[in-house]
Design a protein with these regions (language model features):
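Sequence context surrounding c-type heme c attachment/ligation sites in exported
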Residues: 112-114, 546-547, 552, 569-584, ...
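C-terminal capping alpha-helices of c-type cytochrome domains
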Residues: 202, 529-530, 540-552, 560, ...
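Inter-heme linker and motif-flanking segments adjacent to c-type heme-binding CXXCH motifs
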Residues: 121, 221-227, 234-235, 585, ...
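Sec/Tat-exported extracytoplasmic proteins
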Residues: 48, 141, 364, 582, ...
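Short beta-alpha junctions and helix-cap segments that line functional grooves
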Residues: 57, 122-126, 472, 597-599, ...
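C-type cytochrome heme c attachment motif
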Residues: 135-136, 205, 439, 577-591, ...
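Beta-propeller domains with acidic blade repeats across secreted/periplasmic ectodomains
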Residues: 1-161, 180, 591, 665-666, ...
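Long, ordered, helix-rich scaffold segments
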Residues: 114, 128, 132-133, 140-578, ...
Length: 702
């Protein structure tokens, strides 16, 4: 991950929570990479030691403790950020205890590693069985011999010696010299520093002595210019923008613009109006503008009026306009909603006004719009009147009665596209329009494509209306059960409400819905209602299915399987078939499979215990970020699944079928982490010894 100042990066929402800014409206993804995808380094350093030669100079050296190796990667420009490309690995070993967890460069130029050296590397398990006496430190040096380094003490070095170290081939000396100059406040070196050719090191030394008089924003070296703009943000100095075109410098200008007061900093947003294939510049520009949108509102609008050409830039039209309108609308309140109207008043350009309108509309997804200022209501109505056929979704959210009639007609129109019918059903459900239930039920009862029914089903689930479970269950064999995905979606929806679940188990008890149609996650969802009739049905039809944790029987079977695979592994191609059938709906391996659970490629796959422990007792150690959540809504639904997204306005829960359900924060009655893994136990059930050998051959493939 490349973190610019003031940026936001992708993270595991379930593990780390939402972004700290609810108006960030985006984040940086991980840097692109070419090479080994088993990425799990615990540490890295960019080597500038001068000892190991050109093959390593400037390279990223990153230990991978989980896979007992050390990567070497080239760092390459990628728009305003970077990408990496793997080269020959520095170290590989078959010793599975080799666990390098720290990396650095020493004063001799050698590459140093701290090796944890242990049988496992996990912070999830609280079991204290670490091997505490075997850690070690390694140094990597040229094969020709150890580097010759005379004893030294930088704390006693003279000023002239420290100045000399600023151009040392080893970055360690360059940085330590700057620290010494700063710690000893060697202001007598300022004239000599100013007389030296300007480098990053001399600039840093001058800055450490508070002796930079003019920021070198026009220097020929773009990295000196970039650092100068960083200093501008930190020192609250506003230099002129000039004609800067170097994309990395532009990124820093935008990062500094976020820190600087808007009176002059808004003009710096133009630094983002250049092509950037990484997509970072538009986000940096947005974060800079958003920081001032409310706190310095008057200055923002004065700038827009004083520089109307900025509103016509690609940056503003494609990346800022919609976000800014959404930000004001989402914040709410009279002043912010008036700012939405003020945005519309800035221009007569219908395309740009459409961007503003789209931003306002997106702020109210999932709910009707509040009472808006008259000026904004008029602007919205004028916009909708000019649209061909009207903007139906926007009209619905604004409370337009005629729009409701049109929406219901579209929902029931068999000639309309499935996409349009599902989209309008979703909007009607979010708005709680009870009139939509009957046409939804009609779709579920009739012969329609499973894809349409699945989309309608997710919308219908929001309504607490008994017509929905009746339609599903009375037409189970003829309209639902034939398609596996639709069938399981229907069962999850039925299991989500207590009253519906009671009706469902009555059909199971009467053998009208087959027991075999239920997956373990659906049975577990039923159990969350804590209802005597439902619990009795679970005990009758799925006794023992929900038992978790280690048992003597599980341990015995795991040992048996381990003995089987010790005799030799089987056919990788056949093992892949087993994986795709049993695991791929949730897990990715070798770039194939689902994304509900973690990507397995980077784990300790050569270790049979890793696989067997997780297969037989998956709830014993649930990987952070992949734990399930149980959400009870104020509308009576119980949802279970992974946290797919989270912000200040609500969450998105992803179930085992990859269906995503958005729940607004105000609609959540209770949310808690589940102690039970989504992963079912008994994945190896029904496998012959030959199947097991094939299966593990694929799982443990190098």
């Amino acid at each position: 991950m490349h973190y610019e100042q003031g940026s936001y990066g992708i993270k595991g929402w379930g593990k780390h929570g939402p972004l700290t800014n609810p108006y960030a409206f985006g984040w940086f993804e991980h840097m692109r990479h070419e090479g080994d995808n088993k990425r799990f380094p615990q540490a890295f350093t960019i080597y500038e030691g001068g000892l190991l030669g050109s093959a390593y100079e400037g390279r990223i050296i990153a230990p991978n403790a989980l896979h007992n190796l050390v990567y070497v990667s080239e760092r390459l420009p990628d728009g305003s950020t970077f990408r990496t490309k793997d080269e020959e690995q520095l170290i590989t070993t078959t010793d599975r205890w080799f666990r390098p967890v720290w990396a650095g460069v020493g004063p001799d130029g050698g590459f140093y590693m701290a090796d944890w050296y242990d049988t496992r590397l996990s912070h999830v398990s609280p079991v204290d069985d670490w091997h505490k006496t075997s850690g070690r430190i390694y140094r990597v040096r040229p094969a020709s011999g150890a580097p010759k380094l005379k004893p030294f003490d930088l704390s006693k070095a003279s000023g002239e010696e420290l100045l000399g170290y600023l151009s040392h081939q080893n970055e360690w000396f360059r940085k330590q010299a700057i620290h010494e100059i700063a710690w000893r406040n060697m202001t007598d070196l300022v004239p000599k520093l100013k007389a030296m050719p300007l480098t990053l090191e001399t600039l840093w030394a001058l800055d450490a002595l508070n002796a930079v008089e003019a920021l070198p924003i026009n220097h020929s070296d773009p990295y000196i210019r970039r650092w100068a703009w960083k200093m501008a943000g930190e020192k609250q100095i506003l230099p002129p923008l000039g004609e800067e075109k170097h994309i990395e410098v532009c990124a820093q200008i935008l990062a500094s613009a976020k820190k600087l007061p808007s009176a002059g900093a808004l003009f710096l947003l133009r630094a983002g109006d250049i092509e950037d294939e990484s997509g970072h510049l538009p986000l940096l520009a947005w974060w800079a503008l958003e920081a001032k949108a409310e706190k310095e509102r008057d200055t923002v609008f004065k700038y827009f009026k004083a520089d109307p050409a900025f509103l016509q830039t690609k940056l503003f039209r494609d990346h800022l306009a919609e976000k800014l309108a959404k930000r004001y609308a989402l914040a709410g309140g009279e002043e912010n909603l008036n700012s939405c109207a003020d945005l519309l008043a800035l221009t007569n350009d219908e395309t740009l006004r459409g961007k503003f309108i789209a931003g306002i509309a997106s702020a109210f997804e999932g709910a009707e719009m509040p009472k808006l200022p008259d000026s904004l209501t008029k602007a919205l109505n004028d916009y909708m009147a000019k649209q061909s056929g009207g903007d139906l979704t926007l009209a619905l959210r604004s409370g337009n009665a005629d729009a409701l009639k049109k929406a219901l007609k579209l929902l029931g129109d068999a000639k309309a596209t499935n996409i349009a019918r599902i989209a309008i059903a979703k909007t009607l459900a979010e708005l709680g329009k009870q009139e939509a239930v009957m046409p939804m039920v009609a779709i579920l009862k009739a012969t329609n494509p499973p894809s349409l029914k699945r989309g309608i089903l997710q919308a219908a689930a929001k309504f607490d209306d008994k017509r929905i479970p009746e339609a599903l269950l009375l037409g189970w064999e003829g309209q639902i059960a034939g398609d596996k995905a639709l069938r399981e979606d229907a069962l999850r929806v039925l299991a989500g409400r207590k009253e519906w679940a009671q009706i469902l188990v009555s059909f199971v008890n009467d053998w009208k819905v087959p027991v075999k149609h239920f997956t373990i996650d659906i049975v577990r969802q039923l159990s969350l209602h804590k209802d005597a009739d439902i619990d009795a049905a679970i005990e009758k039809h799925w006794r023992g299915l929900l038992v978790t944790g280690p048992t003597p029987e599980k341990k015995k079977e795991a040992e048996r399987i381990k003995a089987v695979i010790k005799t030799g592994l089987g056919d990788v191609a056949k093992g892949k078939i087993q994986f795709m059938a049993r695991c791929a709906i949730c897990h990715k391996l070798f770039d194939e499979g689902g994304q509900i659970g973690p990507d397995l490629t980077g784990y300790d796959r050569a270790n049979p215990d890793f696989w067997l422990d997780n297969m037989f007792t998956p709830s014993l150690e649930i990987r952070e970020g992949f734990g399930a959540y149980i959400v009870k809504t104020k509308g009576g639904q119980i949802l279970t699944g992974l946290m797919d997204a989270q912000d200040a306005n609500g969450i998105v829960i992803k179930d085992m079928a990859n269906n995503k359900t958005a729940v607004k924060q105000a609609d959540i009655e209770k949310m808690e982490a589940s102690p039970i893994s989504l992963m079912p136990e008994g994945l190896t059930a029904g496998m012959s010894d030959a199947d097991l050998k094939d299966f593990f051959a694929y799982l443990m493939r190098k």
